[in-house]
A protein has these predicted regions:
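Mid-domain beta-loop-alpha active-site segment that forms a flexible
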Residues: 128-135, 158-187, 270, 291
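Beta-loop-alpha module in the N-terminal Rossmann-like domain of NAD(P)-dependent dehydrogenases
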Residues: 27, 57-115
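Hydrophobic residues in well-ordered beta-strands that form the structural core
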Residues: 63, 100, 125-127, 243
Length: 320
């Protein structure tokens, strides 16, 4: 049963957004359009970002996210990854339900603590692995058999976003989440190599993940590429499935019946599913335990890719 914090008895949920960068702005827009939800406040250390958000939505805009504690029923945490654990923990303790952008945390122990806290406080905790909604549209997850092998590639030009963590935690973690949806077997070996050119962390990584049943997944991710590419290839005993997530093209030589990838709004679906779970008390499509599993594999890949050649840059302002 949902415990409303506003005491109004109207059923209107007060939503907050922490961080109004590229993702945070979209989260705010989604909440503003949902029935039964009031976008109440946003928090961002940038005065320019606060002014823009306040102008766009006519809401309270504060510099310190702590000012929102106890004043919202649910919140999207879209701040830099290194700040996720502290902010999520504070809002769970304040009684709010939380949707945190990936990764759930930057440490497995932190993720475990957040999952336990959400359960102890009877609060919903879910993670923004929106690619899952895109992938689910193909219908491939409806088939129980795992592929023999898998390849994933995700590359794009440098934008400066997500530079507080490696490209593995920033981008590859999407593909790791999809990988674990297709491969139920345990990971037994990880090998990787990476390089850094624009940040303190790996900006490009090649990785191979081997599973207990002998299957393998090969992954490539880059945030310093010249062109944008996103796709996957899954090989089965009766053929192969290749998906281009940029062109929305699906090539299928297997006996599985798949659906075309239509234009969609995965972030909107993610926010709407979160709100529905809060209102109805049900489960979210992305369980925090699944996000924790993707994080664990991501950290194994980070360790395997070290050392990477890195140069020291000026410290960037983080939302702490």
């Amino acid at each position: 049963m949902l415990r409303l914090l506003n005491g109004q008895g109207t059923g209107v949920l007060r939503a907050g957004v922490i961080g109004t960068g590229a993702f945070g702005r979209h989260h705010a827009s989604k909440y503003a359009k949902l029935a039964g939800v009031k976008l109440s406040a946003i928090a961002d250390p940038s005065s320019e970002a606060r002014r823009a958000a306040a102008a766009a939505h006519g809401v309270l805009a504060v510099a310190d996210w702590r000012d929102l504690l106890g004043k919202v029923d649910l919140v999207s945490v879209c701040s830099p990854a290194v700040t996720h654990a502290a902010i999520v923990r504070a809002f769970l303790n304040a009684g709010a339900h939380v949707l945190v952008e990936k990764p759930i945390a930057t440490d497995v122990d932190e993720a475990d603590a957040l999952i336990a806290l959400a359960e102890a406080n009877n609060r919903i905790l879910t993670v923004g692995h929106q690619e899952r909604f895109v992938f689910a549209r193909t219908g491939l997850l409806d088939y129980a058999d795992a592929p023999l092998s898998m390849e994933c590639w995700r590359a794009g030009p440098w934008t400066g976003r997500g530079a507080d963590v490696s490209v593995v935690l920033d981008l590859m973690i999407h593909d790791l989440d999809l990988m674990h949806q297709l491969f139920p077997s345990n990971v037994v070996d990880v090998s990787a190599r990476g390089r850094s050119t624009h940040s303190r962390h790996a900006d490009e990584v090649n990785a191979t993940v081997t599973f207990e049943n002998g299957s393998q997944a090969k992954l490539f991710v880059s945030r310093i590429a010249e062109t944008r590419r996103r796709g996957m290839l899954a090989v089965y005993p009766d053929g192969a499935i290749e998906i281009d997530f940029v062109t929305r093209e699906v090539r299928n030589s297997t006996t599985r019946v798949l659906h075309p990838l239509t234009q969609d709004d995965p972030l909107g679906e993610s926010v709407a599913a979160f709100v529905k779970a809060v209102r109805e008390g049900g489960a979210t499509p992305i369980r925090p335990e699944e996000a924790r599993r993707a994080l664990e594999t991501a950290l194994l890949i980070e360790d395997a890719a070290m050392p990477v050649q890195s140069r020291v840059l000026e410290p960037q302002a983080l939302y702490a």
